[in-house]
Amino acid sequence: MNSIIDLFPAFLLVFIRISAFFVTIPLFGHRNVPAVHRIGFAFFLAVICFSTIDKPPSLEIDEHYMLLAFKEALVGLCLGLIAYMMIAAVQIAGSFIDFQMGFSIANVIDPQTGAQSPLIGQFIYTMALLFMLSVNAHHLLLDGIYYSFQYISVDQAFPNFGDEKFAYFIAKSFNAMFIIAFQMSAPVVASLFLVDLALGIVARTVPQLNVFVVGLPLKIAVSFIMLIVCMSVIFVVVRNVFSLTIETMRNLLALVGVS
């Protein structure tokens, strides 16, 4: 009984990191998922992780322990946000498409954040999450938080968050996110650009034709046709996004931790 009590502070640190990870991670962090389920899943995963990682020495609950708890929450939030930032490229691609289609005014509520999200972006994002479940990519996300304890132990008080390389890594991750969004939306956006160009030529040659009445349904039809044609390519990009997400999480751990 005494050994269990001595190990409880270290277990609580593991539980804090995993709970913070589940707050921001895609799929598990949705507001539609009950908080009791997330806490329970985080608890059982913390039990599994704690039974396999190297046990730290006995920890006292003092001001140093409060710093460790804050560090664990920060590590979990950073890992979850990096994973969400990579997959959020799908929503950004949808916002590019919505803006060109004329759907930018018709937003829906994002269940992840509660904020407004583009209509096509939310549709593609939901399809990406279902695809993630079908290929078991969510297992890789859980592997990421599990192996984080090998890079950043629970008794390591000060990870290298203040390093210049960390700021460069975050900027590079943002750059990768927008590049992926551009790659996913480029076929549809380019097609809509050609439609706008054709409508401009028609407006100059046939002034009697109201291009504003014809243009909106035409652009919507072309957009859906291009989405159907390019859907397989979009899923290939989404699969690469999953691989990039895991690679980004591991690079972050290698950067701020000690392997």
From Swiss-Prot:
<keyword id="KW-0472">Membrane</keyword>
<feature type="transmembrane region" description="Helical">
    <location>
        <begin position="33"/>
        <end position="53"/>
    </location>
</feature>
<dbReference type="InterPro" id="IPR002010">
    <property type="entry name" value="T3SS_IM_R"/>
</dbReference>
<keyword id="KW-0975">Bacterial flagellum</keyword>
<comment type="similarity">
    <text>Belongs to the FliR/MopE/SpaR family.</text>
</comment>
<dbReference type="InterPro" id="IPR006303">
    <property type="entry name" value="FliR"/>
</dbReference>
<keyword id="KW-0812">Transmembrane</keyword>
<dbReference type="GO" id="GO:0071978">
    <property type="term" value="P:bacterial-type flagellum-dependent swarming motility"/>
</dbReference>
<dbReference type="GO" id="GO:0006605">
    <property type="term" value="P:protein targeting"/>
</dbReference>
<dbReference type="GO" id="GO:0009425">
    <property type="term" value="C:bacterial-type flagellum basal body"/>
</dbReference>
<feature type="transmembrane region" description="Helical">
    <location>
        <begin position="177"/>
        <end position="197"/>
    </location>
</feature>
<protein>
    <recommendedName>
        <fullName>Flagellar biosynthetic protein FliR</fullName>
    </recommendedName>
</protein>
<dbReference type="GO" id="GO:0005886">
    <property type="term" value="C:plasma membrane"/>
</dbReference>
<keyword id="KW-1003">Cell membrane</keyword>
<dbReference type="GO" id="GO:0044780">
    <property type="term" value="P:bacterial-type flagellum assembly"/>
</dbReference>
<feature type="transmembrane region" description="Helical">
    <location>
        <begin position="218"/>
        <end position="238"/>
    </location>
</feature>
<comment type="function">
    <text>Role in flagellar biosynthesis.</text>
</comment>
<feature type="transmembrane region" description="Helical">
    <location>
        <begin position="8"/>
        <end position="28"/>
    </location>
</feature>
<dbReference type="Pfam" id="PF01311">
    <property type="entry name" value="Bac_export_1"/>
</dbReference>
<keyword id="KW-1133">Transmembrane helix</keyword>
<feature type="transmembrane region" description="Helical">
    <location>
        <begin position="117"/>
        <end position="137"/>
    </location>
</feature>
<feature type="transmembrane region" description="Helical">
    <location>
        <begin position="73"/>
        <end position="93"/>
    </location>
</feature>
